[in-house]
């Protein structure tokens, strides 16, 4: 069957043959398939003991690395748009589109794990000896993805050494890693963007003050309702629960408490950025906040899918080598990988926790006419 993009489907059609003076390259030349398809070197075959499943192992990991490259390409373009001194809001749709593309790529990567699992532990053992000292820990591109997303060095789980030491004397890899640590991450750029959310101005709509007043009124109404509870034990339980909720809200209204949580690593956003994220969540139906809300949702999707990919990888490793063996690169294998599933690797943790601070729709501060016009007309 001929390629549907190569012409009218007639293999003997002379018009499908590129003329010698035409500009451009044929399919294989354009994609450099001679290099791509010749990059599968089975060490078991070189050792005159070919193991069939080593080919699958190589292909799958090469496919991962190609998709990692595309994710980095998308992240860099998004970071460039967000890093502008004045962000062009007409670019928001393009940012959303590219983030969605990353989400779809990550879904594909998650779905690739079951293909590797068609290989049994015994099949893997047949060629595992050829892999050392190679390790997935040495995937420079995955480290770049983590850094460009916003994983902090101090948040990383340490196993035997600093994560960049595995690249040894590879100057190019080390330089790329260093640059990714210095450059503003997606987390930092999104934080700056959220800090400029319209409606946070203290001399304007002052959303944060209005939100705090709404929370106080909401909780006071709950206290009043609890006091009318005829059963003393039930009343005390409700009052205790309300007080716990008041403490939770205090953690976002008290700047000092918030900063302490950031310092401890339990929060990532600045206080102002958290305010912006909460405001966008409440007023996401307003035209100006519709795409920003989609953007925040996609960032959570990316975090979720990376966590899911890590989890699937952990389970696969446990199935293949168990939980006690060392990884081929010298790490603790399963134990190390399992430790990366914690919230310390979740970059946009604050977005996941926004639901903690929601209040009923009827309690959300109503928009006044000036801010409503501002949120309808982007040019205001």
Swiss-Prot record:
> Which protein, by its recorded name, is this?
Tryptophan 2,3-dioxygenase
Q: Which sites bind heme?
A: 313
**E.C. designation(s):** 1.13.11.11
Q: Which HAMAP family match?
A: T23O (MF_01972)
Binding partners and assembly? Homotetramer. Dimer of dimers.
Job of this protein: Heme-dependent dioxygenase that catalyzes the oxidative cleavage of the L-tryptophan (L-Trp) pyrrole ring and converts L-tryptophan to N-formyl-L-kynurenine. Catalyzes the oxidative cleavage of the indole moiety.
Which residues does substrate bind? 57-61, 128, 328
Which reactions fall under this protein's catalytic activity?
L-tryptophan + O2 = N-formyl-L-kynurenine
| Organism domain of life | Eukaryota
Keyword tags: Dioxygenase, Heme, Iron, Metal-binding, Oxidoreductase, Tryptophan catabolism
- Give any GO molecular function from the UniProt entry: tryptophan 2,3-dioxygenase activity
For activity, the cofactor(s) needed are: heme
Q: Which PANTHER family would you find in this protein's record?
A: TRYPTOPHAN 2,3-DIOXYGENASE
Listed InterPro entries: Trp/Indoleamine_2_3_dOase-like (IPR037217), Trp_2_3_dOase (IPR004981)
Q: Biological process GO annotation list?
A: L-tryptophan catabolic process to acetyl-CoA; L-tryptophan catabolic process to kynurenine; ommochrome biosynthetic process; protein homotetramerization
The pathway noted for it is: Amino-acid degradation; L-tryptophan degradation via kynurenine pathway; L-kynurenine from L-tryptophan: step 1/2; Pigment biosynthesis; ommochrome biosynthesis
Family named by the database record:
Belongs to the tryptophan 2,3-dioxygenase family.
How is the co-factor bound, per the entry?
A: Binds 1 heme group per subunit.
Enzyme category, top tier: oxidoreductase
């Amino acid at each position: 069957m001929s390629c549907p993009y190569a012409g009218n489907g007639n293999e003997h059609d002379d018009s499908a043959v590129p003329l010698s003076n035409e500009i451009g390259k044929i399919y294989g030349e354009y994609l450099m398939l001679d290099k791509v398809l010749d990059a599968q070197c089975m060490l078991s075959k070189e050792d005159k003991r070919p193991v069939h499943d080593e080919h699958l192992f190589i292909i799958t990991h090469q496919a991962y690395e190609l998709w990692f490259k595309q994710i980095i390409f998308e992240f860099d373009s998004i970071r460039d748009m967000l890093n502008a001194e004045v962000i062009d809001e007409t670019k928001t749709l393009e940012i959303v589109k590219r983030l969605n593309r990353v989400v779809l790529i990550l879904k594909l990567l998650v779905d690739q794990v079951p293909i590797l699992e068609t290989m049994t532990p015994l099949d893997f053992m047949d060629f595992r000896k050829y892999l050392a000292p190679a390790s997935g820990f040495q995937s420079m591109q995955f480290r770049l993805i983590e850094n460009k997303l916003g994983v902090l060095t101090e948040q990383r789980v340490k196993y035997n050494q600093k994560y960049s030491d595995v690249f040894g004397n590879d100057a190019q890899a080390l330089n790329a890693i260093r640059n990714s640590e210095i450059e503003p991450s997606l987390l930092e750029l999104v934080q700056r963007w959220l800090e400029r959310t319209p409606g946070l101005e203290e001399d304007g709509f002052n959303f944060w003050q209005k939100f705090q007043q709404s929370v106080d009124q909401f909780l006071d109404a709950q206290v009043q309702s609890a006091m009318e509870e005829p059963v003393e034990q039930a009343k005390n339980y409700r009052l205790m629960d309300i007080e716990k909720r008041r403490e939770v809200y205090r953690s976002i209204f008290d700047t000092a408490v918030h900063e302490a949580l950031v310092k401890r690593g339990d929060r990532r956003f600045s206080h102002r950025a958290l305010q912006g994220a909460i405001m966008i969540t409440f007023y996401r139906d307003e035209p100006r906040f519709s795409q920003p809300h989609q953007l925040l949702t996609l960032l959570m999707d990316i975090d979720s899918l990376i966590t899911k990919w890590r989890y699937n990888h952990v389970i696969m490793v446990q199935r293949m080598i168990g939980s006690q063996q060392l990884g081929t690169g010298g790490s603790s294998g399963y134990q190390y990988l399992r430790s990366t599933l914690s919230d310390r690797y979740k970059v946009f943790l604050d977005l996941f926790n926004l639901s903690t601070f929601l209040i009923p729709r009827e309690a959300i501060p109503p928009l006044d006419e000036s801010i409503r016009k501002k949120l309808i007309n982007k040019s205001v």
